[in-house]
């Protein structure tokens, strides 16, 4: 309700979040005012471990997964249907063909890609053109102050093709709020304290904590919170169209919304560039193993 009252009209979920529970909750929350919301969900990640054919981007699974999402969301159409992750084991034209059928059937209005490399975005665009399928309208990359790798190829590709960019994890799973101190235990109840697997593999680094503390001190000196600073940095990039915010509390939500009015200066930009080199992560090895690089090994044959 707070989001709606603030004018937010774009809501993002996925079939794999909490085994489908996120879609059910989202559907219930917006059902009374479905037409005022731009509803996005995703396909590609596994919904349940140990079961066959419940993930990936095969034609069979994409069609089944879409029907499952529609049922959980309680709607007859999905406004934006993301390919949640690349699936090198499935021919791209098979996936795109399935998406085209969903669009023609009226079950999906538009589609997008998430966690795709720049060269794969180009392949998606070419495949859509060849197969006569509407091209993707948005890309959802993992992009924030601590991970600037999308600036190398992903964002330029989106800019070139006119694809919107909806960045996720804008505060790096909480690290950019400044809540984690170098050499100190993680705050009780935080992701760090829970030893969140994905966070332990990427953001949970002493170097990242130190950078976050420097940015927090600078932000507060200029009348902003660390969260407002992190979001203002994203908004200052003209290629970024939208930001996926995931606050857990109303207080965190207010911090996000006030970031819309936060100013950005050349001094801010210079400080960020001095701490995290453009196009690079904050520290060597900072990459999500869930989405590996393929430069030293072949992708699966298609």
Predicted features along the sequence, with ranges:
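Conserved, mostly hydrophobic/aromatic
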Residues: 3, 11, 26, 39, ...
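Terminal-tail/helix-coil boundary detector
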Residues: 184-217, 221, 236-241, 250, ...
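Glycine/proline-rich, positively charged
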Residues: 5, 48-153, 160-164
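Glycine-rich beta-alpha junction loops
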Residues: 43-45, 117, 143-147, 169-176, ...
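Generic structural signal for well-ordered alpha-helices
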Residues: 1, 23, 27, 66-70, ...
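Aromatic-lined glycan-binding groove of carbohydrate-active enzymes
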Residues: 150-190, 225
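N-terminal binding-site loop/beta-alpha segment at the start of enzyme catalytic domains
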Residues: 1-41
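A short, structured active-site edge motif that brings together acidic residues
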Residues: 36-48, 140-141
């Amino acid at each position: 309700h707070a989001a709606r009252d603030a004018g937010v009209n774009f809501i993002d979920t996925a079939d794999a979040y909490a085994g489908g529970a996120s879609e059910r909750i989202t559907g219930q929350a917006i059902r009374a005012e479905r037409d005022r919301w731009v509803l996005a969900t995703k396909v590609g990640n596994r919904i349940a471990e140990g079961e066959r054919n419940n993930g990936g981007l095969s034609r069979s699974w994409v069609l089944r997964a879409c029907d499952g999402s529609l049922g959980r969301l309680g709607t007859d159409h999905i406004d934006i249907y993301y390919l949640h992750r690349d699936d090198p084991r499935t021919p791209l034209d098979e996936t795109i063909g399935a998406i085209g059928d969903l669009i023609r059937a009226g079950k999906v209005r538009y589609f997008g890609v998430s966690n795709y490399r720049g060269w794969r975005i180009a392949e998606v665009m070419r495949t859509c053109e060849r197969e006569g399928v509407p091209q993707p309208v948005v890309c959802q990359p993992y992009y924030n102050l601590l991970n600037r790798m999308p600036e190398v190829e992903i964002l330029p590709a989106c800019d070139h093709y006119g694809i919107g960019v909806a960045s996720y994890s804008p505060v790096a799973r909480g690290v950019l709020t400044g809540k984690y101190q170098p050499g100190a235990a993680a705050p009780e109840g935080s992701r760090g304290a829970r030893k969140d697997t994905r966070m332990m593999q990427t953001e949970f680094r002493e170097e990242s904590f130190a950078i976050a503390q420097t940015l927090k001190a600078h932000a507060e000196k200029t009348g902003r919170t660390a969260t407002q600073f992190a979001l203002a940095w994203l908004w200052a990039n003209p290629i970024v169209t939208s930001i996926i915010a995931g606050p857990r509390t109303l207080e965190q939500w207010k911090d996000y919304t006030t970031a819309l009015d936060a100013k950005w200066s050349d001094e801010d930009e210079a400080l960020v560039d001095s701490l995290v080199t453009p196009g690079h992560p904050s520290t060597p090895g900072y990459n999500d193993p869930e989405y590996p690089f393929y430069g030293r090994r072949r992708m699966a044959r298609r």
